[in-house]
Amino acid sequence: MIVTLPARSGIELSVTTPPSKSYTHRALIAAALAQGRSTIVRPLMADDTKLTIASLMKLGVAIHADQHNIMLEGCDGSFPNTPGTVLDLDNSGTSLRLLASAALLATYPVTLTGSARMQERPLGPLAHTLNDLGGMVIFTKKEGYPPVTIGGRLLGGTATIDGSQSSQFASSVMMAAPYSKGPVDLTVTGTPASQSYLDITAGVMTDFGAVIRREGYRRFLVSNCNHYTGRTFVVEGDYSSASYFFALAAICGGKVTVAGLAPDSVQGDRLFLDALQRMGCEVTYAHDGVTVENQGPLTGITINMSSAPDTVQTLCMVAAVARTPTIITGIGHLKFKESDRIAVTADRLRMLGGIVTAERDRIVIQPATLHGGRIDPVNDHRTAMSFAVLGLGIGGITITGAECVNKSFPGFWEILSKVME
């Protein structure tokens, strides 16, 4: 699928954000492990979450899903899978990482694999921790990377995990921990990447009945005496998906309102709104949504986005049209996403005339006169959506492989077509 974006200005748009991918993944796994029946209301039905659903069904969980609800019969902490279970998670890092620890709760060993890019995404820190807690983790191709076969049992105890590459490693252990043989005392070393996602994990676990004591983002103690209980769980709206429409208002000028956002959400990508406000946009919060309005030039800022990784590329697009430089730090872990997002973003902006300096943990974007061009997002949904928004600001940008947005936001192009008309 190829999409060419025309230049637009004076945007007036009201949309409802899709449900959160992060919450949907975690609610699915908690419900699958719970005792009793759960209904997940307003889940995100996208490629990644469908992979999690399919994998849980392969592990023996009874699931019925439609576009509005997902019903699960929990397995009470023991997946009744069959010998030789293989879970192909394609390029869904969240699915593979969260399910890796849960695989220790399966009757038979589980092999997790994925796309060529997935096999380049590190899993070593999680494997070391699972081995310390009673698992038997075997990498079948390259040490530290999928494919991986996971057996053994989650015995519990004290362990450490390196959180500098991804907070999903710690989230994975935490989500399985209520069903360990003993309590789990997990210490996160390094500077935790995307630490706000640990708040999401802990929140979902608590909602399903787990008991967690924590010391900030450094230590999590999970009881094995309080298991998950089936319940009805309503998935909140996604701030990262909403960011593309907020960026439209900033880049094209105009006013965009996004409904379906919890004002008290712990999602780290809320930081994107603070960034827009600092750059010159007017941001208004209401009970069930947020409005962003911009009628003038944007000013560059310096900001640490370590807690809001999924909106870094969107912010880069806004920075590219600002009248002063922008410095974004705390982004080193983006190298391990669906693509090396730091390198890809810098390269594609330069193709459009941007002046960009990319380093290990930061990116600097200077004011420049931009022009159109052809953008290959290398099958990365967030790259495609970010450059689409920039395309509506400057015109003449063509996105190839545009269907990759289905990974997290199947309705993206349909909504954007309202602006393109």
From Swiss-Prot:
Keywords for the protein's UniProt record, in alphabetical order: Amino-acid biosynthesis, Aromatic amino acid biosynthesis, Cytoplasm, Transferase
Involved pathway(s): Metabolic intermediate biosynthesis; chorismate biosynthesis
Binding site for phosphoenolpyruvate: K21, G93, R121, Q168, R341, R382, K407
Catalytic activity, EC: 2.5.1.19
InterPro entries: Enolpyruvate_Tfrase_dom, Enolpyruvate_Tfrase_sf, EPSP_synthase, EPSP_synthase_CS, RNA3'P_cycl/enolpyr_Trfase_a/b
Reaction it catalyzes: 3-phosphoshikimate + phosphoenolpyruvate = 5-O-(1-carboxyvinyl)-3-phosphoshikimate + phosphate
Gene3D superfamilies linked: Enolpyruvate transferase domain
CDD domains registered for this protein in UniProt: EPSP_synthase
Residues given in the record as 3-phosphoshikimate binding sites: K21, S22, R26, S166, S167, Q168, S194, D310, K337
Keyword Transcription tagged: no
Record-level GO BP terms: amino acid biosynthetic process; aromatic amino acid family biosynthetic process; chorismate biosynthetic process
Positions of the catalytic residues: D310 (proton acceptor)
One GO location term (cellular component): cytoplasm
GO molecular-function terms, A-Z: 3-phosphoshikimate 1-carboxyvinyltransferase activity
Family indicated by similarity: Belongs to the EPSP synthase family.
Physiological role: Catalyzes the transfer of the enolpyruvyl moiety of phosphoenolpyruvate (PEP) to the 5-hydroxyl of shikimate-3-phosphate (S3P) to produce enolpyruvyl shikimate-3-phosphate and inorganic phosphate.
Official protein name in the record: 3-phosphoshikimate 1-carboxyvinyltransferase
Source species: Methanoregula boonei (strain DSM 21154 / JCM 14090 / 6A8)
Gene: aroA
